[in-house]
Each structure stands twice: as C-alpha cells, then as structure tokens.
C-alpha cells in the first residue's frame, strides 16, 4: 500500500492535485483542510496517503498530516460513511473541531456538513465518542501551526469563484447551494482556496 508520496506539485484543482514522483503523475483527492497547506505549483511537497480500491476505480486520498489520515480511516470504518463523505467532513472541520464536536455531542454542527443527516451524525457520535481522549496529551492530535494560504494562479478560463463552486460541488454540495455559498463570501481579492475556506466556515 502507498502510505506516503513526496514529489513536485504539478496541478492544483480543489479538491484534486497532480503530484509528480520521479516522472510518474499521481492524482490525489485532498480534504480542504489539507489543501490549504499545499505549497505553490512547481514546488516539492509531501502527502500521507490512503488508497481506496473499488470495482470501478482505485482512488488515492492525500493528507498533510498523519492525524488527518488517521481520522479519515476512522471515519470510513463508520457504518454509512464512505470516502467521499469522509472527505467532506474533513474539509468542513479540522481534526480538533471534529473531535470536540463529537466529544461534546454537538449534533447541530455535524448535520451542517453536506451528506451528513441526523442519523449519520448520531451514528458518528455513538461510534467515535471516546476515541479522542488523547487530545489532552501534547503528543497526540497536535494541531498544525497556522499556515498562510498561498496565492495560486487561476485556470485560464475559470475564475476563482468558478473553481470554488466546482470544489464545493465535488465535496457534496448541490450546484445552486455551492454558488450561493461562494457568492456570500465573494471578494475580488480572494483566491479560490480562500473562497472555499470562507464558504465552508460560513456554512458552519
């Protein structure tokens, strides 16, 4: 199994990236919480990975930290939570935010995530509550330091708003809802990544 990749970042199109590792291009899907930590295209980066094998495709998911990957693996063990929904959850909340929502049984926060209904949220509470007690330990689930989101070059024909809407749709939001979310936080000076971050923050 591929557990880690290090190479040159060739393309960034939220939530996907293309990573060149010794001449081989790997397509990876990243939660937005990891996407925000990526360097500019053309630079070296390292991602921790998890491979999902399906009948119709092999999907490679990438994460900026092992902690993010650990939570992803815990999520997909939960009944009714597949990789796509796990990606949406990790895009909407950081590991700490999700852990606290679970430990405090904040059902109202969980159901705001696209694809998470009341039953799924309740199942997450039942199956994951108590698994985050290590948060009190300094060497477990340590929050990554704040990283400024780098500016990125927009695609030739797509505006940052278009890219942000497309990314939100890929994360499970319906197109009209995604467009409304982006419009609400739109600012001419924001990159697509910043728009996505603000839209997800406002949704919660």
Swiss-Prot record:
This is Holliday junction branch migration complex subunit RuvA. The gene is ruvA. GO terms for molecular function: ATP binding; four-way junction DNA binding; four-way junction helicase activity. Has three domains with a flexible linker between the domains II and III and assumes an 'L' shape. Domain III is highly mobile and contacts RuvB. SMART domains: HhH1. One of its GO terms (biological process) is DNA recombination. Residues 65-143 are annotated as: Domain II. It is found in: Cytoplasm. Homotetramer. Forms an RuvA(8)-RuvB(12)-Holliday junction (HJ) complex. HJ DNA is sandwiched between 2 RuvA tetramers; dsDNA enters through RuvA and exits via RuvB. An RuvB hexamer assembles on each DNA strand where it exits the tetramer. Each RuvB hexamer is contacted by two RuvA subunits (via domain III) on 2 adjacent RuvB subunits; this complex drives branch migration. In the full resolvosome a probable DNA-RuvA(4)-RuvB(12)-RuvC(2) complex forms which resolves the HJ. Gene3D superfamilies: 5' to 3' exonuclease, C-terminal subdomain, DNA helicase RuvA subunit, C-terminal domain, Nucleic acid-binding proteins. Residues 144-155 are annotated as: Flexible linker. It comes from Actinobacillus succinogenes (strain ATCC 55618 / DSM 22257 / CCUG 43843 / 130Z). Keywords: Cytoplasm, DNA damage, DNA recombination, DNA repair, DNA-binding.
């Amino acid at each position: 199994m591929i557990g880690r990749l290090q190479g040159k970042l060739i393309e960034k199109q939220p939530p996907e990236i293309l990573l060149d590792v010794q001449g081989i291009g790997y397509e990876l899907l990243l939660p937005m919480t990891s996407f925000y930590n990526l360097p500019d295209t053309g630079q070296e980066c390292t991602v921790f990975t998890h491979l999902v094998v399906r009948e119709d495709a092999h999907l490679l998911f990438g994460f900026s930290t092992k902690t993010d990957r650990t939570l992803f693996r815990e999520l997909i063990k939960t009944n009714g939570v597949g990789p796509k929904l796990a990606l949406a959850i990790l895009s909407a909340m950081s590991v700490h935010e999700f852990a606290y929502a679970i430990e405090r049984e904040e059902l109202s926060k969980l159901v705001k995530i696209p694809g998470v209904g009341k039953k799924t949220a309740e199942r997450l509470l039942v199956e994951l509550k108590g698994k985050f007690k290590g948060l009190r330990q300094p060497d477990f689930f340590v929050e990554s330091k704040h990283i400024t989101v780098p500016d990125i070059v927009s695609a030739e024909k797509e505006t940052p708003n278009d890219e942000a809407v497309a990314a939100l749709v890929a994360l499970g939001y319906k197109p009209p809802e995604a467009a409304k979310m982006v419009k609400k936080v739109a600012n001419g000076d924001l990159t697509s990544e910043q728009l996505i971050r603000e839209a997800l923050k406002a949704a919660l």
